[in-house]
Amino acid sequence: MSQNIDYSKGIYDARQLGAGRMLILGVQHMFAMFGATVLVPLLTGLSVSTTLLCAGLGTLLFHFITKGKVPAFLGSSFAYLGGFSIVAPMLADADGNLTIANTQMLPYACAGVAFSGLVYLAVSLLISTFGIRRIMRFFPPVVTGPIIIAIGLILAPSAISNCQANWLLAFVALGTVIVCNIWGKGMVKILPILIGVLVSYAVALVTGAVDFERIASAAWFGIPLHKEAMGLFAIDGSPEFISALFTIIPIALATMMEHVGDIAAISATVGHNYINDPGLNRTLMGDGLATTLAGLLGGPANTTYGENTGVLALSKIYDPLVIRNAAVLAIILSFSPKFEAVINTIPTGIIGGISFVLYGMISAIGVRNVVENRVDFTNSRNLIIAAVILVSALGFNSVGGLTFVVAGVSINLSGLAIAAIVGILLNAILPGNDYEFDSADGADAPSSGNLQV
């Protein structure tokens, strides 16, 4: 039955391809998200297995809430790395490299992630009640763009710190990612992070920079949940918990707009306006609840992945069932500590090289956000909002944020939190807010690109 299939117009029901091809397509989607998804736990100290479990479960939950209509995969969000670096910064090992997880503070960071997902849910309900155009006026590109720029700049020092562990591996990883992005074709262009890790890992093997001791002692099967990292058990009303909320929740204000761009990109690829059907309220709700689930279980925030949108465009297989197959495969892999041990052997220098370009790309995507939305910086209003956001984020971050006491509880506002609050307030107060969001044009909106935030 699958011998005479016309791929030119796209395949919307992959069952006609047969079980074997559907499985291969699912594996392809899993590899598309893999490099970026496992990099986040390596940069934050979270469990790779828990991250894969949360990506798989989050994707299935998203598909359930969106009625199985949207062919999107949810993986780890890079945008939240800035929040993790503030709430639970990696600790230095004996050689001075930032490789040790901050186990004391990670649960609070995950709790912040869980509550940030509820922001998506709240905005989803507001959109259902008041309409999408009224709500989106509070989150224009002149606010979200500079916040994304600041996230990348705040992370830059940690990238250099990791590179210093092994500059050779860092340059190989960095160079490979650049070559794949600029000159790569087809799947090579879609998988720059994964290929960068594989090539630099091969160099690490040749130079003897890989330690296999942990692999031999790891079990083949294990439960991918670790109580000590779960955000569920960190919701305790402590100053650490409150400060984590104020630090991480504002990031959701920026990532929501990236979500809109990604859904628009999927719409343009498939030829169906998912912003209208099943509706942005449902896609936001699905993404938000997936993020809340991940945070409660001790995983990073989830986000729709641009890499998988690229796979859709290449393969022309648009059936969401294929994405759900990839989600199930990710869940299966999460139950293997042996697999996690292999991932954890990736040298710090490689992580540094990948994050070198990755963190820069986060800031560059923020620039792209304001450029593609034609933000007019000859307008003093827009210039002031962007300037105050950037200085607030970077300036307060350099001095440890702003600490104050409310009802006997010490609360610390990070630079990102202050920047988001000030940006939204200035946008609401200053005259001249002419931003209009048009869901009918959603399929033409800019996406966040292949290096997903």
Where are these regions (language model features)?
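Membrane-embedded alpha-helical modules
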Residues: 105-213, 327-439
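Short, non-helical or kinked segments that cap or interrupt transmembrane helices
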Residues: 46-51, 68-81, 135-144, 189-195, ...
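Interfacial segments of multi-pass membrane proteins
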Residues: 85-91, 181, 308-323, 329-334
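Intrinsically disordered, low-complexity non-transmembrane regions of multi-pass membrane transporters
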Residues: 1-24, 212-232, 268-275, 283, ...
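Hydrophobic, membrane-embedded alpha-helices of multi-pass small-molecule transporters
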Residues: 20-35, 169-173, 191-192, 223-262, ...
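Membrane-embedded helical hairpins/re-entrant loop segments and their flanking transmembrane helices
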Residues: 10-20, 42-63, 67-69, 249-320, ...
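Juxtamembrane interface elements at the cytosolic ends of transmembrane helices
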Residues: 6-7, 34-37, 173-180, 191, ...
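N-terminal signal-anchor module of multipass membrane proteins
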Residues: 1-74, 78-103
